[in-house]
């Protein structure tokens, strides 16, 4: 094994751990208390053992503090059992315990013998338990060191030629977040960076200032922490045995975990555990003292699916006491916000029972808040700001008339603002400045997308703490930094509760907030009355299709205890409501059911991988579409002929699948493997991307046991993946491995969920007698298997080498040179296929030929010219050349702000860069950039439009930066970001063409580097010049670079670039909003 093969993988470990050593070097540094050094390798050892210990890497955060003994106190199996039982009992994160579950024993029996395994061992524990090599390592290092390795270190085993897998320790994927994972990786070559015209000198000048500020901030944070955790407030911190902080070095980008070890704790209790890197506000999470402001977030997901009325509003809830329930008082609210959290209402009380003097002085103010809340006319304010229009006289109005009646985020903000003015006493704001700033944050929060969040640090930005006299114990005298820090923490807790508890709770009480199918991630706010009418009309339409049968109370009572009841909800579409059925719950029964659903999905995928014909013409995405079109496009370009296109969309595909046909199809899939044993492995993969930094992915994989007998343990599995070329320079962490599932188990569970599908809507319960739930993870595969079976029966004569049929779940596309085949396909599907529940939506049928019989029978059929750009699933296909373009008409009237979730994080600039790089990787797909399937003109046009949309995304991200950050404050960084994206785009274009395009900066190849760079300049100049004041410095550099590129490009290539960029602002981009 060459160390050079492992060097990139070891670089990942060194970027995350301060100490990384080979086990041999780790052992050489140990001196036992008996006076001699540890000897891991002896001359008589076999080469196999020497190779084994040299392939083990030990990573740790802090060196061993106590002097260990060399004594062998217990055997390796006993020590392993002790560690596993301890980890499970203390609920610590350790890879060694993955797959180890306690048996159903009483607590007394579990604690009786800690040296005995209380369950089956699999995965890492089984690998160590059954290894003679690990037993020899344990004997030579002694029990103390072996236990230290298992409990406090992260140990990785090398698998030649270039990968590692983790054996024990906190999972490596928990040691970094994607928000900061891109640090420490250079994206630009030196030559490219020198083109930034003085950018590096600007960065150097900024670095010294940042280093000084970072040092000051670290010192202040340490003082603040000491003050905040002093006295009575230290009580909760002492409950945690060890806490860890994440500290980042801005220059190297390494993450160091620093252990804090209370002196009163024993060594055995000082194992490293990770506190949450982020979480919710303390009043909701119950974490006191609260997390640092930059790690505490309010999420817009909290708005969703409310509409339960004011009775559920926090300030209207009652406190549980020994005498019963009573209304909350001022001191109760103080305890909820600053001490106990929402669990206080359920009777939870912590010390101190008597409020400290500072908080006791706040009681009158919070009592006034509650009095003003009880007098506040919420209904009148709601009707004033978000009035209902014609809802009482609607009667049996159409569903489409209610869909547009949602309240804009600005109207909701006006309502919330009126309520805050009426309820919150002026003294709590401190000043008009603070109140106006807070209102601005509330307005921003209400306008945010579904997955966005706001940190307490951002909420507190520019708030003047000293204006709030209610925070002070003494109104006069000197204010030390620690006191100011504590006041800031208290104000942060209050403002976080005011947003997450009061504002979010008020919105949930008065509105039903939901996503919509048309606006990606945008949140719609419906008044309760409107949503109730919408939901009622949608449900009537849904149940009229005969897909569900209502159960009587007696039938509901007779349901087996194992029955899982799903919930039905609706999501607004442009012209209707989409039913979504989901299983919601965190109890053991629900978790087991969801686990079985995932297992069924994995086993069906394994069957499909072994017999792809089961899926018929199914394509799962752009990669599959590219593979299909690559088989016919070259021949069409070489010898053009008329092609006939048919696009069909099934109406209600999931809900219309007949159960008898589904059972028949799945029986045919699983019957050949009824007695086959499946292995299901879930693992995490961590790797370093040269352009996007550290990345992680979580993968589930199912295989047949018989075909993978040589890949049972992780080392064998990793070796197999590398031999197949599927993996290199990666770290794997096994999470779950099971090998006890058979095909008959999957068939039995499928039959059970199909015949026993019970759905609850409101107070009524129904049994689904047709179709599959649209929200289930397995529904898409079931739908594709059913339609694949239909295609194999009905269309086997139509599909041949010259024709191709593709189907993305329920969207069909036929491309054929035979007009008769196209007409036959059209007639069959227009007539419907009742045995498969297939009914075509006539409004979504598109063809590029005249068929008078079909046109008469289907008046909504859309006929395009023989030669045109044919739309299908977000693509435009040239019917003559088979060139493929992206269809940007779907972005019309949509705001790009909702298609991106930048988030509030420590390094917003790095997060922005990671987001934009990730989007480039997804959008620069070979489907649009492959010269074998697309003409050069089409590729240039695709690149320009892709980059134009990317420039719009860049602008949206730049406007979303927190803390008043802007491009104007650091143009050097954002200019480098643009050049990094140029290089990455060029790399992706080369990757899509397997070397057909030269990646050098010389003028060779069909699409050269300078051409891509010029397209970047043109697209970014077009977008950013509309906001000249914001991007003045960037525009100057982009104009200079554009002129230089136009001079160095030849006439033909420059003409090709200008052809792609004409018109500069395409028609389909005019309706895109930012």
Curated annotation (Swiss-Prot):
Question: Where does the protein principally reside?
Answer: nucleus
GO MF annotation: an example: telomeric DNA binding
Give the reaction(s) catalysed. Answer: DNA(n) + a 2'-deoxyribonucleoside 5'-triphosphate = DNA(n+1) + diphosphate
Under which EC number(s) is this enzyme classified? 2.7.7.49
Q: What SMART domains does the record point to?
A: Telomerase_RBD
Please tell me whether the keyword Calcium is annotated for this protein: no
> Mind telling me what this protein is named?
Telomerase reverse transcriptase
Q: Does the keyword NAD apply?
A: no
Where is each Reverse transcriptase domain found?
A: 552-877
Name the species this protein comes from: Takifugu rubripes (Japanese pufferfish)
Quaternary assembly: Catalytic subunit of the telomerase holoenzyme complex composed minimally of TERT and the telomerase RNA template component (TERC).
Q: Which example biological process does GO assign this protein?
A: telomere maintenance via telomerase
Q: Name one GO cellular component term.
A: telomerase catalytic core complex
- The ranges of region (Interaction with RNA template) come to 355-360, 461-486
Entry binding sites for Mg(2+): 649, 810-811
Effect on the protein of changing residue 305 to A:
Reduced RNA template binding and moderately impaired telomerase activity
> What is the tissue specificity?
Detected at highest levels in gill, ovary and testis, and at lower levels in brain, eye, heart, skin, spleen and stomach.
């Amino acid at each position: 094994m060459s160390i050079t093969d492992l060097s990139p993988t070891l670089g990942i470990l060194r970027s995350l751990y301060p100490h990384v050593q080979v086990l041999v070097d780790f052992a050489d540094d140990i001196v036992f208390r008996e006076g001699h050094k540890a000897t891991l390798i002896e001359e008589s050892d076999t080469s196999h053992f020497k190779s084994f210990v040299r392939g083990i890497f030990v990573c740790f955060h802090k060196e061993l503090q106590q002097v260990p003994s060399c004594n062998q106190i217990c055997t390796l199996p006993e020590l392993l059992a002790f560690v596993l039982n301890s980890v499970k009992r203390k609920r610590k994160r350790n890879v060694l315990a993955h797959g180890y579950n306690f048996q159903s024993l009483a607590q007394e029996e579990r604690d009786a013998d800690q040296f005995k395994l209380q369950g089956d061992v699999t995965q890492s524990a089984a690998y160590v338990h059954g290894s003679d090599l690990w037993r020899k390592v344990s004997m030579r290092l002694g029990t103390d060191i072996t236990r230290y390795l298992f409990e406090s270190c992260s140990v990785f085993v090398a698998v030649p030629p270039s990968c590692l897998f983790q054996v024990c320790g906190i999972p490596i994927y928990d040691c970094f977040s994607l928000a900061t994972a891109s640090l420490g990786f250079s994206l630009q070559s030196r030559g490219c960076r020198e083109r930034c015209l003085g950018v590096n000198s600007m960065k150097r000048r900024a670095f010294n200032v940042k280093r000084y500020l970072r040092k000051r901030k670290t010192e202040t944070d340490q003082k603040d922490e000491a003050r905040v955790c002093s006295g009575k407030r230290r009580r909760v911190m002492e409950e945690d045995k060890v806490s860890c902080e994440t500290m980042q070095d801005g220059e190297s980008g390494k993450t160091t975990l620093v252990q804090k070890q209370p002196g009163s704790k024993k060594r055995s209790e000082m194992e490293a555990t990770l506190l949450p890197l982020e979480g919710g506000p303390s009043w909701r999470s119950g974490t006191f003292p609260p997390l640092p402001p930059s790690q505490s977030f309010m999420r817009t997901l909290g708005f969703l699916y409310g509409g339960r009325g004011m009775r559920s509003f926090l300030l209207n809830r009652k406190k549980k006491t020994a005498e019963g329930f009573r209304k909350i008082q001022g001191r109760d609210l103080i305890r909820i916000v600053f001490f106990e959290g929402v669990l206080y209402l359920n009777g939870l009380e912590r010390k101190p029972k008597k409020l400290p003097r500072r908080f006791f002085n706040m009681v009158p103010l919070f009592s006034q808040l509650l009095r003003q809340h009880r007098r506040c006319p919420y209904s009148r304010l709601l009707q004033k700001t978000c009035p209902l229009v014609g809802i009482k006289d609607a009667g049996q109005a159409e569903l489409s008339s209610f869909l547009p009646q949602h309240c804009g985020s600005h109207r909701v903000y006006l309502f919330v603002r009126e309520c805050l003015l009426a309820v919150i006493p002026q003294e709590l704001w401190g000043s008009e400045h603070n109140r106006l700033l807070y209102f601005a944050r509330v307005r921003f929060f209400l306008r945010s997308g579904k997955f966005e969040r706001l940190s307490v640090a951002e909420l507190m930005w520019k708030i003047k703490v000293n204006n709030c006299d209610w925070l002070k114990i003494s109104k006069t005298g000197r204010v030390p930094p620690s006191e100011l820090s504590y006041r800031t923490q208290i104000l942060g807790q209050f403002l976080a509760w005011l947003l997450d508890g009061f504002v979010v709770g008020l919105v949930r009480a008065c509105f039903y907030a939901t996503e919509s199918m048309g606006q990606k991630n945008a949140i719609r706010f419906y008044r309760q009355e409107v949503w109730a009418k919408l939901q009622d009309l949608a449900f009537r339409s849904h149940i009229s299709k005969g897909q569900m049968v209502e159960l009587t109370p007696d039938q509901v009572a007779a349901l087996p205890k194992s029955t899982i009841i799903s919930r039905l909800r609706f999501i607004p579409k442009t012209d209707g409501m989409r039913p979504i059925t989901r299983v919601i719950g965190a109890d053991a029964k629900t978790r087991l059911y969801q686990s079985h659903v995932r297992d069924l999905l994995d086993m069906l995928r394994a069957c499909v991988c072994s017999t792809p014909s089961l899926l018929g013409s199914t394509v799962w995405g752009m990669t599959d579409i590219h593979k299909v079109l690559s088989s016919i496009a070259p021949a069409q370009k070489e010898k053009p002929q008329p092609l006939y296109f048919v696009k069909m969309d099934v109406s209600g595909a999931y809900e219309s699948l007949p159960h008898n046909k589904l059972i028949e199809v799945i029986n045919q899939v699983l019957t050949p493997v009824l007695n086959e044993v499946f292995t299901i492995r879930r693992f995490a993969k961590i790797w370093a991307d040269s352009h996007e930094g550290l990345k992680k992915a979580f993968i589930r994989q199912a295989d047949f046991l018989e075909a993978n007998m040589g890949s049972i343990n992780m080392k064998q599995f990793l070796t197999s993946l590398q031999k197949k070329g599927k993996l290199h320079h990666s770290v794997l962490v096994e999470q779950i491995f099971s090998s006890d599932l058979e095909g008959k188990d999957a068939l039995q569970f499928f039959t059970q969920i199909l015949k026993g599908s019970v759905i609850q809507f409101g107070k009524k319960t129904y049994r689904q007698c047709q179709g599959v739930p649209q929200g289930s993870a397995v529904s898409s595969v079931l739908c594709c298997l059913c339609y694949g079976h239909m295609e194999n029966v009905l269309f086997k004569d139509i599909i041949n080498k010259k024709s191709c049929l593709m189907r993305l779940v329920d969207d069909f596309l036929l491309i054929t040179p035979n007009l008769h085949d196209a007409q036959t396909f059209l007639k069959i599907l227009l007539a419907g296929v009742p045995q498969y529940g297939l009914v075509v939506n006539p409004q979504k049928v598109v063809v590029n030929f005249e068929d008078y019989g079909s046109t008469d029978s289907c008046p909504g059929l859309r006929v395009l010219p023989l030669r045109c750009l044919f739309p299908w699933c977000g693509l435009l296909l040239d019917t003559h050349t088979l060139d493929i373009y992206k269809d940007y008409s779907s972005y019309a009237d949509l705001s790009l702000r909702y298609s991106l979730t930048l988030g509030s994080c420590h390094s917003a600039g790095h997060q922005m860069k990671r987001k934009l790089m990730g989007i480039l990787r997804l959008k620069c797909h070979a489907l649009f950039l492959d010269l074998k399937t697309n003409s050069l003109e089409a590729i240039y046009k695709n690149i320009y439009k892709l980059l134009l949309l990317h420039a719009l995304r860049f602008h949206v991200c730049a406007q979303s930066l927190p803390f008043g950050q802007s491009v104007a404050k650091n143009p050097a960084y954002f200019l480098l970001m643009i050049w990094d994206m140029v290089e990455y785009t060029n790399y992706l274009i080369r990757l899509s063409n397997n070397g057909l395009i030269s990646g050098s900066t010389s003028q060779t190849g069909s699409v050269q580097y300078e051409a891509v760079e010029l397209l970047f300049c043109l697209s970014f100049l077009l977008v950013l010049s509309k906001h000249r004041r914001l991007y003045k410095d960037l525009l100057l550099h982009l104009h200079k670079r554009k002129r230089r590129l136009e001079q160095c490009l030849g006439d033909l290539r420059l003409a090709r670039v200008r052809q792609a960029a004409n018109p500069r602002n395409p028609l389909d981009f005019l309706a895109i909003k930012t």
